[in-house]
Amino acid sequence: MRPADRQADQVRPITITRHYTKHAEGSVLVEFGDTKVLCNATVEEGVPRFLKGQGQGWVTAEYGMLPRATNSRNAREAARGKQTGRTMEIQRLIARSLRAAVDLKALGEFTITVDCDVIQADGGTRTASISGACVALVDALNKMVTEGKLKKSPLKSMVAAVSVGIVDGQPLCDLEYVEDSAAETDMNVVMIDDGRMIEVQGTAEGAPFSHEELLALLALAKGGLEKIFEAQKEALKQ
């Protein structure tokens, strides 16, 4: 039996609160069960040096966890003097995912940075970050239109992500921490809202997985992502 008696294909309760802070152009608190992530999108004029003069914009991301987001306190990475490999991998994943949702040429020479700060972690922090960051990005782009910086939003599609895995031989969707830590196979799937995939990260933690299990996990992810897209679009109506 899963925590909270969830079915194998069921995502956790999703709450997306927009305009959570007042300064950022886009600000979202996203909650997947007990995982809570604050996603703030900042718009700045100019682009990184490697894009100067090319007439296109850039979307990037940073990711971090508050010291007491987990059961025991973890020192801030700034106090250690460097980011961990895990942090760098996650923020690159978030950034790649968001760039797939935006027409960078239509964005023009602006940079949008989405900061994803994990307030509370209970599994799926990177996937929750992507799903919440997309909504914050939409709000930031819409604000650029309202302020006259853009004629229309360069958003091409919504993007969301979910974790899936095999626990005790059973494929499950949207893993909580206790499930994730016991998973024989762990996978993160990023998708745009027409069903096409941006990224699939799959690792056999305890035992190799078969082609049939891979297809089952991807099918679970697709079903879960449809629910997440619904939650995103419902939040954007409010």
Swiss-Prot record:
Coiled coil: none annotated. Pfam families: RNase_PH, RNase_PH_C. Phosphorolytic 3'-5' exoribonuclease that plays an important role in tRNA 3'-end maturation. Removes nucleotide residues following the 3'-CCA terminus of tRNAs; can also add nucleotides to the ends of RNA molecules by using nucleoside diphosphates as substrates, but this may not be physiologically important. Probably plays a role in initiation of 16S rRNA degradation (leading to ribosome degradation) during starvation. GO terms for molecular function: 3'-5'-RNA exonuclease activity; tRNA binding; tRNA nucleotidyltransferase activity. The keyword DNA repair does not apply. It comes from the Bacteria. Homohexameric ring arranged as a trimer of dimers. It catalyses: tRNA(n+1) + phosphate = tRNA(n) + a ribonucleoside 5'-diphosphate. This is Ribonuclease PH. It comes from Proteus mirabilis (strain HI4320).
